Amino acid sequence: MPVMGCSVCSAFAELSRWAHGYPGGQTDAVAIEGDLWQLNLQILDVLEIDHASFVNFVFLGKGLTCIPWGTRGEFFTSWIQGLLERCSCPSVDIHKQLFYYGIYMCYFLTVYLLLYPSPVIIKYARSFFRGEQLWHLLCKFEWVIEKFMEYVFKINFNHPVIKINEGDLESYMFLRKKLKRQYLTPQLAVPPLFTRLPPSLQFIDEGHTHLDTHGEALASALKSCCEDVPCGSPFDSMVKNLALRCALSHQFSVIPVSDQSPNIVTQIREKILSISVLACVVRVPILSATVWSLVETKRPTFFVYCGECKHCLNFGKGKFLKVNFNPTHAFYCRDQKEKQCNVCATTGRIYCSFCGSADIHTASLTQMLDGVPIIRAVMANNAAFMLDTAQRSVDFILPCLGTHAKCEGSVLRRLSLLQLLYLTLNASELMCARCQS
């Protein structure tokens, strides 16, 4: 019998009341969500497991410090025995039952509360506690979770819920080849302007709204061929931008990797990969107190770069020494066209001429960030990722730290990566010709 005042017995009573109190399949999931959170936290507290650590264990597979998971069952049994020895309550059978069932029940409830609020999970969890899958407790933990996933999601899946591949990033630089996709994005169409606007607001020169007979006939023939105007997929574009912004705002994001993924998923994956890998800037370590003080008083010199392709848009127009990705990489530039800013004559918006993005940013070559000086070296392209050897030489734009009234603001240096890392040992290396004279 449960003992009054015992936290383990109290948690067992709550769990038993929940498992037997409602008929399976007739409970409103939204109405009991608060009770499930409380029940989950109560069981974890009895098991002496931190909630955040358990969530990381369920979804990311991070080990729990309190449970030495292993391939053999005695590890789990020794953990249970340790919990029993710390309890003074005489209801040992109830304690043992809660400890054995509790870790699985918390796993099921965590998946329900944070991933998939399906009544199927509630039904499975209740039947599990009532002993309908009692023989599962004789099997390994991973096998029990695999059967739970198979029952709920109808697929073969095992622990943890989210798999993280820690392979080298270069292994995901897919070859430049066209993929045969089975998904086709539907294109939308809208009524043409002449059905929605008067002639004075259409694309007709002012003062020439009246057409002659031949002009009217031609316009009528053209209108009969334009019952609608294609406008692409604005909804897909909106969803893609929202998903991309949301993924970039978090430290981690999970994107499916498959040749059969919908086109919108592929575009999001490629953009996240490119934004995370491409760069035209290298941070230069400051090794001299003189350079430190010069950066503090230096008026910043700005450069312009694209937020998507990460090319510097006001440097690189010419023959500069640079590194590039291998021709088999997705980011290899085959056209090598000039990079600059294009300005729309109608809206005034600025676009990157290299990739067409309107995500244009500016940054300074020198900056004080939380009291720490920063020096940035800018390359002529976006392949800073390929600076993999200390002897590789590249042309860099660096800030001029001089104080001449007609200072040019920046200097061009051809340096190896090793020279760049030790450049700040001598402040004169970061001065233009006018400041040195």
From Swiss-Prot:
Q: What is its main location?
A: host cell
Q: Which GO terms describe its biological process?
A: viral process
Q: Which residue windows are transmembrane per the record?
A: 102-122, 272-292
Query: Pfam families of this UniProt entry?
Result: Herpes_UL49_1
| Key words of the record | Host membrane, Membrane, Transmembrane, Transmembrane helix
GO cellular component terms, alphabetically, are: host cell membrane; membrane; viral tegument
Q: Which family does it belong to?
A: Belongs to the herpesviridae UL49 family.
Query: What is this protein called in UniProt?
Result: Uncharacterized gene 66 protein
Gene this chain is encoded by:
66
